[in-house]
Structures are given as C-alpha cells and as structure tokens.
C-alpha cells in the first residue's frame, strides 16, 4: 500500500538536482563553441543582477552600450582618389588661366589648396565626397555631348537638326568672311546640304570671276562625302548643286515674296530640294527703307509647307558692323532677333565684342564672361582666320559657344563645364574661409585675457 506524500526513490547513479529559484531560468547547457583544451565541465554562471523577490528580471538587467560610430575603413578608395585627381587637374588649369588673364585684377581671389596631396590630406571627408560627386557630374556632362562629336572632338554639324538656319556673320574687311561662307558649305557643316545656292550682292558685276569659280567648286565639293573603296557619295538629290548669282534689287521684287507666284525664283528652287541664300556686302541695302524681314521668319515656314522636298532653308547675312546706325526698315534688328547663329570674327572692335558678350552671357559667372573676352583677345592677335560662334538654340548646352579653326574644325568651348568648375572653386574657397574663421574664433576663446 503506497504511502501518500512519499517521494519516489531516486534512480541509480542519478544525483539530486537543487530546486531552482522561481525567478531564475533553468541552467543552460554548455556553449557550442568552446576550446576543447580548456573546456570547463561546470562553467560558472554569468554574473548578473539579483532579480529580487518578485521573480521578474528588471528592465535594465543588461546594460546597453552607448551608440558607437560605424567603423570606417580608408577615407577614399581607388575610384574616389581617381575622381578627385581628375577634378583637381581641371580646377588647377582653370584657376591658373583665370589668374593669368589681364583682367584678373577685377576678380575676387579664391582660396585653394596648394597641391593635390594637401587636398587629399586636409580636405576632409565631407569636402572630398562633394568633389567626387562633382567630378561624376562633369563626366556625365561630357558623355551627354559625346554622341554629337566626331572622334577628334570636333562638331559634326553647325545646326544639326535645327531649321531654318538663320545666321549672321560679323567681321571687318579682310577677315575672310567670303572664305568662311564657302567653307561652311564645302565642309558640310550646314545640314542638309543645299541643292541650290543663291549668292546675293549689291550688283552682280562686282563679283570677281575667281570668286564665282571658287563658289561653284566648293559647293560641289560639299555635295559629296568619301565612301568605301575610294568612292564618293552624293549628299543631296542632285549631282551638281546650282549656283545662282543675284543682285539685291532682284531679291526685293514683289513676286519673290509670294510662294504661289510661278515667277518666284526661290519657290522654283525649293520645289527641287533644300536652298541657301547668301547675302554678302549688303549691309547698306539692308539698312534702307525696303523691308526684307520676311526672308528671316515668314518665308521659311511657307516654303516648308508648300514644298515637302525643301527640307532645309539657310540664310547667311554678312555685316561689317555689329551695331550699324542705319536701319530704317528694321531689317537688321529683325535679323538679329530671328538669327539662330552669330559667327563673330575676333578682329571686330573690342568695344563691340564686349557689348555682345555682356548681352549674351547673362547666365554665366563673371569670371567665365571675362575668360570669353580673353579668348576673343587671344585669337585677335593671331594671323589665323578663326571664328567664334554663338548658337542661340544649341543641340546641347556645351555647344552654345564654339570656335572654328582652319585646322581643328568646329570645336565646342564647353563654357557650361567651365562654369560648373568655377562653382566648385567657389565651394572650396567657402570651405577654407569657414575653417579659418573657426580657427580664429577658437584661438580667441582659448587665449587668456
């Protein structure tokens, strides 16, 4: 008969287990990861706070460490150092160029690091990370314009897909304006290639025969491009573009304004393909009472609507003065407003160049505007027939200002990137100024009075 309340007999070889405290957990088994040579059979329990009589562990049983900053490895990896080095080379070149300008006295001096090593050592993590992002943005800007350029970095076209092409050529006598006009057509910088070229002068007899032959040869040259295996490929729908010389008085005849008139010589040519109108030595005629501004804004759209084959309309006007006083009919003023391109000879009078640059560089920093004026001054001292071109509606912002060199071709000036780099120089200047101000304040506070 079993006795109530008696504990059952313990099993053989079983040790008595002490009764656990109600507020304590059961004893844990030995940890999994232990050194086998120094494994303790009965490791001591981890020291902890007494849970107290309530049996609940306090909320602050395990003391938490204060938040620690994340461990950082090297401040800059290899790619970041490459970005900073590449950007530093550009910044150093721009800074030296600005300091060497004759007009550098009017610019605010910018503080900068003495060398690349000083920048990498003392720049600080925040500034260096900012420079890395800025150089990545510069690379993106260069990659965006790369499809519009040839392999040598020159522009493949002056207008690309822009239509109509209304351009003004500014230059004094003897600067090569006539040669520039022929080169634009022969080098296929105007697209599409015109099939008919109208050369308009005050009088037909004043055009020398040698110049007429040069026009005929160069527009024929511009109609072909080299092909494979020594072949040539026509660039238009004709094998020989037409060259038509006209007097200015024939241009302003009434029937030449009406595209539906069968006597309109421009409509007849537009029915066959693209056309180009060249006005040379006509500045005095344009300043007269007869208005011809229709050729700059209304006439192109009418030709495009009526003649689908006329896929290109180009008007290039030569002016000897950037601001002529005589403009009774407003032709020159309307021409400047409608013009998409301004081709400027660096040999123009400096006062006229400065006025033009001040007008069309409102969005650029003052330093870049002065740099552009210095570029004009530099090319004016050379004997080459260089031209600087301003495009009001460029295919890309980097192509807004270009220069045309007889050997290098049409090269973009990248003034947008130069402006971006100048803003980076200003950022470095502000950072160094802040550090100097903080250092002065710290020394003033620590210096005993």
Swiss-Prot record:
Keyword Calcium set for record: no
Description of what induces expression: Expressed in the intermediate phase of the viral replicative cycle.
Subcellular locations according to the entry: Virion; Host nucleus, Host nucleoplasm; Host nucleus, Host nucleolus
Chain sites annotated for binding ATP: 171-178
Region (Disordered): 1-77
CC per GO annotation: host cell nucleolus; host cell nucleoplasm; virion component
Key words of the record: Activator, ATP-binding, DNA-binding, Host nucleus, Nucleotide-binding, Phosphoprotein, Transcription, Transcription regulation, Viral genome packaging, Viral release from host cell, Virion
Pfam family, any one: Adeno_IVa2
Phenotypic consequence of gene deletion: Empty capsids are produced in the absence of packaging protein 1.
GO biological process, alphabetically ordered: DNA-templated transcription; nuclear capsid assembly; regulation of DNA-templated transcription; viral DNA genome packaging; viral DNA genome packaging via site-specific sequence recognition; viral release from host cell; viral transcription
Region (DNA-binding): 440-449
Molecular function terms from GO: ATP binding; DNA binding
Assembly information from the UniProt record: Homodimer. Part of a genome packaging complex composed of packaging proteins 1, 2 and 3; this complex specifically binds to the packaging sequence on the left end of viral genomic DNA and performs packaging of the viral genome. Interacts with protein 33K.
Described purpose of this protein according to its UniProt entry: Component of the packaging machinery which encapsidates the viral DNA into preformed capsids and transcriptional activator of the viral major late promoter (MLP). Binds, along with packaging proteins 2 and 3, to the specific packaging sequence on the left end of viral genomic DNA and displays ATPase activity thereby providing the power stroke of the packaging machinery. The activity of packaging protein IVa2 is stimulated by protein 33K which acts as a terminase. May be the protein that pumps DNA into the capsid powered by ATP hydrolysis.
Family: Belongs to the adenoviridae packaging protein 1 family.
Protein name: Packaging protein 1
């Amino acid at each position: 008969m079993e006795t109530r309340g008696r504990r059952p007999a313990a099993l053989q070889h079983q040790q008595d287990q002490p009764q656990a405290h109600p507020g304590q957990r059961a004893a844990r088994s030995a940890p999994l990861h232990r050194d086998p040579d120094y494994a303790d059979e009965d490791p001591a329990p981890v020291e902890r706070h007494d849970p107290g009589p309530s049996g609940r562990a306090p909320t602050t049983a395990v003391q938490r460490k204060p938040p620690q900053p994340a461990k950082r490895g090297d401040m800059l990896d290899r790619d970041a150092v490459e970005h900073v080095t590449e950007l530093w080379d550009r910044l150093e070149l721009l800074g030296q160029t600005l300091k060497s300008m004759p007009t550098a006295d009017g610019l605010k001096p910018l503080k900068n690091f003495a060398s690349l090593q000083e920048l990498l050592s003392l720049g600080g993590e925040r500034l260096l990370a900012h420079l890395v992002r800025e150089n990545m943005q510069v690379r993106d800007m260069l990659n965006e314009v790369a499809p519009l350029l040839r392999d040598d970095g020159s522009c493949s076209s002056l207008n690309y897909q822009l239509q109509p092409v209304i351009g003004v050529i500014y230059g004094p006598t003897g600067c090569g304006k006539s040669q520039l006009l022929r080169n634009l057509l022969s080098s296929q910088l105007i697209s599409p290639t015109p099939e008919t070229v109208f050369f308009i002068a005050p009088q037909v007899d004043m055009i020398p025969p040698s110049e007429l032959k040069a026009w005929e040869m160069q527009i024929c040259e511009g109609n072909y491009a080299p092909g494979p295996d020594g072949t040539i490929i026509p660039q238009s729908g004709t094998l020989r573009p037409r060259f038509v010389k006209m007097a200015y008085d024939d241009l302003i005849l009434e029937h030449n304004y009406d595209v539906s008139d069968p006597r309109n010589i421009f409509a007849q040519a537009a029915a066959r393909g693209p056309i180009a109108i060249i006005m040379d030595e006509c500045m005095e005629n344009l300043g007269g009472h007869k208005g011809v501004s229709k050729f700059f804004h209304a006439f192109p759209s009418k030709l495009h609507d009526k003649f689908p084959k006329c896929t290109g309309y180009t008007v290039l006007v030569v002016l000897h003065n950037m601001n002529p006083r005589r403009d009774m009919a407003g032709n020159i003023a309307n021409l400047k407003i409608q013009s998409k391109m301004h081709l400027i000879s660096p040999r123009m009078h400096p006062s006229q160049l400065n006025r033009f640059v001040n007008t069309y560089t409102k969005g650029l920093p003052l330093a870049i505007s002065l740099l552009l004026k210095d570029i004009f001054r530099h090319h004016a001292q050379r004997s080459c027939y260089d031209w600087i071109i301003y495009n009001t509606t460029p295919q890309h912002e980097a192509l807004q200002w270009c220069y045309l060199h007889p050997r290098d071709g049409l090269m973009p000036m990248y003034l947008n990137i130069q402006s971006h780099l100048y803003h980076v120089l200003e950022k470095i200047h502000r950072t160094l100024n802040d550090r100097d101000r903080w250092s002065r304040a710290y020394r003033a506070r620590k210096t005993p009075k």
